[in-house]
Design a protein with these regions (language model features):
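Small/polar beta-strand repeat architecture
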Residues: 148-209
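Autoprocessing Asn-cyclization modules and mimics
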Residues: 74-170
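N-terminal secretory signal peptides that target proteins for export/translocation
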Residues: 1-3
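Aliphatic-rich helix starts adjacent to a transmembrane/signal segment
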Residues: 7-60, 64, 297
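Short linear sequence signals and composition-biased patches located at protein termini or domain-edge surfaces
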Residues: 46-47, 60, 73-76, 88-91, ...
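Short, well-structured beta-strand/strand-turn elements
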Residues: 64-73
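Residue-level detector of secondary-structure boundary/capping sites
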Residues: 50, 120-123, 272
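Flexible, membrane-facing loop/turn or short amphipathic-helix motifs
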Residues: 96-98, 171-175, 268-271
Length: 299
């Protein structure tokens, strides 16, 4: 009588099956780890991109609100790592009156301004102790701190006198000279701490942390159709940023937009993933008869 065939498996077959199983598990594990790594990387990238986009949106929104797109050197000197500009802090521009003498020299050297405002009292103006910007039709502006505000001509008068000690009007009076209540705003990047700061008045607060790179570019367009990108704005003889600059070859350049480039590094699976984001903002130019080409320092 013959012995029946064994229904079991041999040791070799068992080892082969285990080897195949090990290979399958290894492939599956590798695929799972790879998938998790891709997912983690994607989450880090998405988080970084969203963060950078929000920061750029905040910056560009502020820049769009700059008074006639004016770039200044208060509180920071404007360059590729920091920028200053003026925001309208409320109300429309107030009409400025000429001085009684009608002499521009007396207006330039005076430390007071008379305006027309249909308000019941000085408190409604909310100018005392605030910053103001004087803008003339020559496209010049000056910023000063308002001291006291008094009514001229008695009760019911719409004329008000603003005194700003320690700073003259500096610019000429022209028809259609206006005064705005403003707030000087500055942005500053500290590469050592990788922090972007925002300063308003004497207060400086962090705007964004863990920023690995930050750069500002000033985009000028020429009357000859050329575009020039600079790491700092053109300056006037007084050292102030100007919207319009005439090159030695006669080409007139106009500052039309700012480009903001920002980057951040995010940790992922023991590695660092760096992402960048760039945004541009068009600067308001006013119109042909009124705008700001230069914010001059008061003297």
């Amino acid at each position: 009588m013959r012995r029946g065939l064994s229904s079991g498996i041999t040791l070799v077959e068992l080892l082969a099956a285990l080897a195949v199983l090990g290979i399958v598990l290894t492939v599956a594990y590798s695929a799972m780890v790879s998938g998790l790594r891709v997912q983690t990387d994607q989450e880090a990238i998405t988080t970084s991109q969203a963060k950078l986009r929000r920061v750029v949106e905040v910056i560009t929104q502020d820049l769009r609100s700059a008074v006639f797109g004016s770039i200044t050197n208060q509180p920071f000197t404007s360059n590729d790592r920091q920028i200053s500009f003026a925001l309208i802090a409320g109300g429309a521009g107030y009409q400025v009156l000429p001085h009684d003498s009608g002499n521009n020299h007396s207006f330039r050297t005076a430390n007071n301004v008379q305006i027309i405002a249909t308000v019941a009292n000085a408190a409604e103006l909310d100018l005392a102790g605030r910053q103001a910007m004087l803008v003339n039709a020559n496209r010049q502006a000056v910023i000063f701190n308002v001291g006291n505000v008094t009514q001229r001509g008695g009760p019911g008068s719409v004329e008000w006198s603003l005194v700003h000690d320690g700073c003259n009007n500096t610019i000429d009076y022209t028809p259609n000279t206006l005064l705005f209540r403003i707030e000087s705003l500055g942005l500053r990047y500290d590469a050592a701490t990788q922090t972007l700061y925002q300063r308003s008045g004497a207060s400086e607060v962090p705007l964004a942390f863990d920023i690995s790179g930050f750069r500002l570019d000033y985009v000028y367009e020429g009357t000859d159709g050329t575009t020039e990108i600079r790491s700092s704005p053109y300056l006037s003889p007084a050292g102030q940023p100007v919207r319009q600059f005439t090159r030695p070859d006669g080409v007139v350049l106009q500052l039309v937009r700012l480009q903001v480039s920002i980057s951040a590094a995010a940790p992922s699976q023991g590695r660092v993933i760096e992402r960048s984001f760039t945004g541009q903002v068009e600067l308001l130019t006013g119109n042909k008869s009124f705008g700001i080409d230069e914010v001059v320092p008061c003297n």
